[in-house]
Regions:
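Hydrophobic beta-strand positions in extracellular immunoglobulin-like domains
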Residues: 82-84, 103
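Short beta-strand edge/turn micro-motifs at domain boundaries
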Residues: 96-125
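Short, well-ordered beta-to-alpha junction loops that form the rim of enzyme active sites
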Residues: 81-82, 116
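Amphipathic alpha-helical repeat scaffolds
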Residues: 12-13
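A solvent-exposed, acidic/Ser-Thr-rich amphipathic alpha-helical stretch
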Residues: 2-5, 17-72, 80, 91-95
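A short, structured loop/turn motif at beta-sheet edges
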Residues: 68-76, 103-109
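Short, surface-exposed beta-strand-loop junctions and turns on beta-sheet-rich folds
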Residues: 84-85, 119
């Protein structure tokens, strides 16, 4: 398994398990999440961590597709089709998503610097 693919899977497992120590290590200080959801189109790192720790519940997830595109020795893009069963603030978020992640290699290892998520029609995991 590619090192960046392993980091991608570790990150999503950390989100599902609310492993804040792993998320602190895997998310760059400049991290942003772009969702396009009204009122929360873009979340910064601190808000993302707070939501993940307290309001977002993932019961099950999988990657149906995952492609790593290396941009050189210090950067990569990961495109994926991701499916989850979960909720945020009690609202069902069980559906597939298209995700585009940008990773940067830092002295401490690979870090996610930005994620763009596009929800697709619900189909359940």
């Amino acid at each position: 398994m590619h090192e960046i693919e392993a980091s991608e899977r570790e990150l999503q497992s950390a989100v599902a398990g609310r492993d804040m120590e792993a998320l602190e290590r895997l998310l760059g200080q400049e991290f942003t999440l772009t969702t396009g959801r009204p009122g929360h189109e873009v979340r910064g790192r601190a808000e993302y961590l707070e939501v993940t720790a307290t309001r977002y519940v993932i019961e099950e997830f999988r990657f149906d597709e995952l492609e790593v595109i290396e941009l050189g020795p210090g950067a990569a893009v990961v495109r994926s089709r991701y499916v989850q069963r979960g909720a945020m603030d009690g609202v069902d978020r069980s559906q597939p998503f298209l995700m585009t992640d940008v990773w940067a290699h830092r002295p401490a290892g690979w870090q996610l610097v930005t994620r763009h998520v596009s929800p697709l029609a619900s189909s359940g995991p």
